[in-house]
């Protein structure tokens, strides 16, 4: 047998995969585990690709060049058209920094390594995932890397070893072991890298090279295995969510589910197989690749351009739009190339692929050279958009494990260390306030030292990551050696209690078993902060507790820039003060209690200067965005809250005059 028989049920499986992914990405309730659709695609690809290679190998006509040309013909035309369209739409919608980042994504994707880029960008300050139009191409990069490596591995093992199937299975087990280990230690690598994903593709591959004599099942067993396979997939789609450690062992459910369905329907269709082979599912399966390509850019650009949160009707319309674009891509791009109506020869398709890589790669590089073409925007829109960018001077003050001790602190104001009488200690919200601390220190002739680490609450014992615990210990140890009288604690406090404004619970405080409970988190913060304040006071330090600025439910730079491009007013953009007070109720009560119980504790609240008498906590003032994102103040925003920090600087100034910076002066 040299030709791979077409199986309608596999196209039906593709439909299940793409539906799950699309509904998950669009936030449709009930599909919290829809991301496993990618894993379904991996297993199917592994099975089909291995079948193609092995059948041609058995027939004595396998060619690496022909194989790679076939993959290029199948994958690249639709991908390149989508990328070109995304670049065109980005011209009209994206802020310069985001357009530059899109160009970077394009460069990495045409080189088949976008998964490496997005793995590195899976950080605290990177552009939110729903603002990266090509984020979904990471899975294509994984498959493309597999297509390069796997044929070589399969041919090598099958030609050199008698028990090559066992060797291939051993590779699968090693990959699975790496995935399980990486989920616990390096989750971003587990998610994005081929070595930790290869076992899913190899699971399909092992099925393809299994001796056909082992395929036959009784009707009863085939029906049972088929039902079990579908149940495993649905269980993952409906029960998994973003908190599920993934892939690792959790990916066994969709992987084994797909293997079971392909295996059970290999010789005779089961009830589930006939369902998968239905006209609707097969039709969706046929366009699944193109639909997958288009659904994410549609969602991202809609989010980017929308001035309001997308509602159910918006979501429905966008899903249908992505489906239509997917169909058009399949009909007018995929099919002509697959049927060899365009560039039929091997040399032609490889030459066209090379040209596509060069053209798109150079276009992406040009966006880097031109800083995202800022001249596309009006001056006001550009001013708003720039607010999302952090200056390198601020980024350098974000410490991590690699930061040497002599660079743990950033110093502002009076350069003499003995006069640095205040320490600002916190997470990235402390970093965001550098402009106001820098200017205040210079204006008052005092010194300020700042230590901050992203996502690290400045309360010992509450750190959710080991590196945060190490950072806090280093700060505490340095504090005993420094001439510091005042300690200013700054953090995104509500993040650790309730998650971010979008509901991401990645940084919340949890119990000993890793479970989140709001009441327990509040109790942990209260006890931990009380202990920290007591220890600082016992060390002779005055403590300043800085409450967080009102959290916006949208990204002000994006919203304001879009409004400016549409010539619409921006003076009513912000958050209702009632919403701010509601979210901050427990934190406000806790801070007030700490201050009332100890005269050496002062509470600093930015809200009174950010919220007006009309009850609006503004996101913009004087043509400038006060925020870089939903929660970090921009440089303009940081300077705007200078009045609430004036008591701190006056105290530092008075202490410097009394004791030349002595930590115990006027304590």
PLM region descriptions:
Residues 1-343, 359:
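Membrane-interface helix/loop caps of multi-pass membrane proteins
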Residues 242, 306-317, 323-327, 331, ...:
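Extracellular/periplasmic envelope-modification machinery, especially enzymes
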């Amino acid at each position: 047998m040299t030709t791979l028989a077409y199986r309608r049920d596999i196209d039906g499986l593709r439909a299940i995969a793409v539906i799950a992914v699309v509904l998950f990405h669009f936030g449709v309730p009930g599909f919290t585990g829809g991301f496993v659709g990618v894993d379904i695609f991996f297993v199917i690809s592994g099975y089909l690709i291995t079948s193609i290679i092995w059948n041609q190998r058995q027939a004595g006509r396998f060619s690496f060049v022909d194989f790679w040309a076939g993959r290029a013909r199948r994958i690249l035309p639709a991908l390149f058209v989508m990328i070109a369209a995304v670049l065109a739409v980005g011209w009209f919608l994206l802020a310069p920094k985001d357009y530059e980042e899109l160009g970077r994504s394009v460069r990495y994707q045409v080189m088949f390594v976008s998964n490496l880029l997005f793995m590195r960008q899976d950080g605290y300050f990177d552009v939110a995932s729903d603002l990266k139009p090509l984020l979904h191409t990471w899975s294509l990069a994984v498959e493309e890397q597999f297509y390069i490596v796997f044929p070589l591995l399969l041919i090598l093992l099958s030609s050199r070893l008698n028990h090559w199937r066992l060797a291939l299975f051993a590779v699968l087990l090693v990959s699975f072991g790496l995935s399980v280990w990486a989920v616990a230690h390096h989750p971003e690598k587990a998610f994005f890298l081929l070595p930790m994903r290869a076992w899913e593709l190899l699971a399909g591959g092992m099925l393809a090279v299994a001796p056909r004599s082992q395929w036959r099942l009784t009707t009863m067993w085939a029906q049972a295995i088929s039902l079990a396979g579908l149940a495993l997939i649905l269980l993952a789609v409906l029960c998994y969510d973003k908190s599920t450690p993934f892939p690792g062992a959790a990916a066994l459910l969709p992987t084994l589910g797909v293997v079971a369905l392909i295996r059970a329907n290999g010789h005779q269709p089961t009830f589930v197989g006939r369902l998968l082979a239905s006209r609707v599912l097969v039709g969706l399966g046929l366009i699944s690749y193109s639909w997958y390509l288009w659904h994410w850019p549609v969602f991202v650009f809609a989010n980017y351009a929308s001035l309001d949160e997308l509602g159910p009707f918006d979501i429905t319309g966008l899903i249908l739009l992505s489906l239509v674009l997917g169909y058009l891509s399949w009909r007018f791009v995929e099919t002509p190339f697959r049927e060899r109506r365009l560039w039929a020869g091997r040399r032609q398709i490889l030459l066209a692929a090379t040209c596509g890589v060069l053209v798109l790669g150079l276009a992406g590089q040009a966006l880097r050279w031109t800083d995202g073409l800022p001249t596309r925007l009006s001056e006001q829109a550009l001013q708003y958009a720039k607010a999302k960018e952090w200056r390198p001077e601020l980024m350098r003050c974000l410490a991590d494990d690699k930061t040497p001790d002599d660079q743990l602190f950033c110093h502002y104001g009076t350069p003499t260390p003995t006069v640095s009488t205040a320490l600002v200690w916190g997470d990235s919200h402390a970093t965001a306030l550098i402009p106001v601390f820098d200017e205040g220190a210079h204006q008052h002739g005092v010194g300020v030292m700042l230590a901050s680490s992203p996502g690290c609450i400045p309360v010992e014992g509450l750190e959710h990551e080991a590196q945060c615990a190490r950072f806090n210990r280093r700060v505490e140890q340095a504090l005993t050696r420094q001439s510091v009288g005042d300690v200013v604690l700054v953090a995104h406090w509500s993040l650790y209690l309730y998650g971010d404004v979008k509901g991401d619970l990645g940084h919340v405080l949890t119990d000993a078993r890793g479970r989140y409970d709001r009441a327990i988190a509040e109790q942990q913060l209260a006890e931990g902060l009380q202990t920290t304040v007591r220890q600082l006071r016992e060390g002779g330090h005055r403590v300043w507790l800085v409450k967080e600025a009102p959290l916006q439910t949208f990204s002000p730079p994006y919203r304001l820039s879009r409004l400016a491009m549409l010539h619409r007013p921006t003076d009513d953009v912000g958050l209702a003060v009632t919403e701010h007070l509601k979210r901050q109720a427990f934190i406000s009560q806790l801070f007030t209690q700490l201050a009332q119980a100890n005269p050496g504790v002062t509470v600093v609240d930015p809200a009174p200067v950010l919220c007006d008498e009309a009850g609006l906590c503004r996101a913009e003032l004087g043509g400038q965005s006060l925020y870089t994102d939903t929660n970090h103040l921009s440089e303009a925003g940081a300077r705007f809250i200078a009045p609430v920090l004036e008591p701190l600087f006056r105290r530092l100034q008075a202490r410097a005059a009394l004791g030349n910076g002595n930590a115990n002066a006027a304590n």
